UniProtKB/Swiss-Prot annotation:
Belongs to the type I cytokine receptor family. Type 5 subfamily. Residues 34-134, 139-235, 240-333 form the Fibronectin type-III domain. One of its GO terms (biological process) is negative regulation of immunoglobulin production. This is Interleukin-13 receptor subunit alpha-2. Keywords: Cell membrane, Disulfide bond, Glycoprotein, Membrane, Receptor, Repeat, Signal, Transmembrane, Transmembrane helix. Cleaved by MMP8 leading to a soluble form that is also able to interact with IL13. The gene is IL13RA2. Residues 364-380 are cytoplasmic. It is found in: Cell membrane. Cell surface receptor that plays a role in the regulation of IL-13-mediated responses. Functions as a decoy receptor that inhibits IL-13- and IL-4-mediated signal transduction via the JAK-STAT pathway and thereby modulates immune responses and inflammation. Serves as a functional signaling receptor for IL-13 in an alternative pathway involving AP-1 ultimately leading to the production of TGFB1. Residues 1-26 form the signal peptide.
Amino acid sequence: MAFVCLAIGCLYTFLISTTFGCTSSSDTEIKVNPPQDFEIVDPGYLGYLYLQWQPPLSLDHFKECTVEYELKYRNIGSETWKTIITKNLHYKDGFDLNKGIEAKIHTLLPWQCTNGSEVQSSWAETTYWISPQGIPETKVQDMDCVYYNWQYLLCSWKPGIGVLLDTNYNLFYWYEGLDHALQCVDYIKADGQNIGCRFPYLEASDYKDFYICVNGSSENKPIRSSYFTFQLQNIVKPLPPVYLTFTRESSCEIKLKWSIPLGPIPARCFDYEIEIREDDTTLVTATVENETYTLKTTNETRQLCFVVRSKVNIYCSDDGIWSEWSDKQCWEGEDLSKKTLLRFWLPFGFILILVIFVTGLLLRKPNTYPKMIPEFFCDT
């Protein structure tokens, strides 16, 4: 009787396992299938790809369990995997299309459905490559993009090595919010070739991955495409600070002050670098967060000059580009100012005395004429 019950129990377990897509060799060992139809899809967004899959076989009736998936992916050659655990059947992320992509995924069954321990399926794997055309040397060289004053994006490049004069390059870009990739409409040219792009106003493009592809064409040989990804706030080059001033706080302190650069960047987003010089020799170089700097000084006779430049700080970006230096502002100590005034007033005083003397002579000459005229008539 016990043997019959045991046989019935085993048969029941087998039927349940078959129905739910799992197999069980004991009460604690359950196996689950990996996801189906795992693939990487390129929607034409220059590096922003879709990873998608279908549920494992025979899990449609597993209603009491929430199935999860562990997804790992990376560019081929990268040392680390990105890992995501999700309940969805798709995931999106950006990749470097200059390299291949590899990804793998498996199914996770939670402990509530598996007698107290999580069950993982085997891995399903896939890869994706852009079919390369042309040798690597034909792609653009020295690509450089700058977001000037957080307003205007400009990218420039040099032609590939050994390309012929008929080679021309075209730039395409995309960021989240655009329906499709757009081509540059305002190229910078040199000798008839496109060597850069001036972008239009980029609405709602901050703090998003910005994808660029520069491809090329030539009648003589294929040209290799290049892909670039960055975020605009990390390549901002602001304007330099303005309205530099000095204020003597005490006999041993001078306060340097300036105003934030013109433009849309908030004051809280700036770092500043100051360079202070004494007689063309660098005295101090400092980085500050505010628009003031107090300098300790003991020699009142020296001349001090300073310049300031700005950069977007870590509170508003991960990186940035220093602005150009501001116009130079100089201050002179008291004694030196007196000497300067003396050098100015000495020649001016001499000229003033000379003018007074000559004026006096001219005013005295008319007084001699009345005496001379009567004497002249008396002699006749």
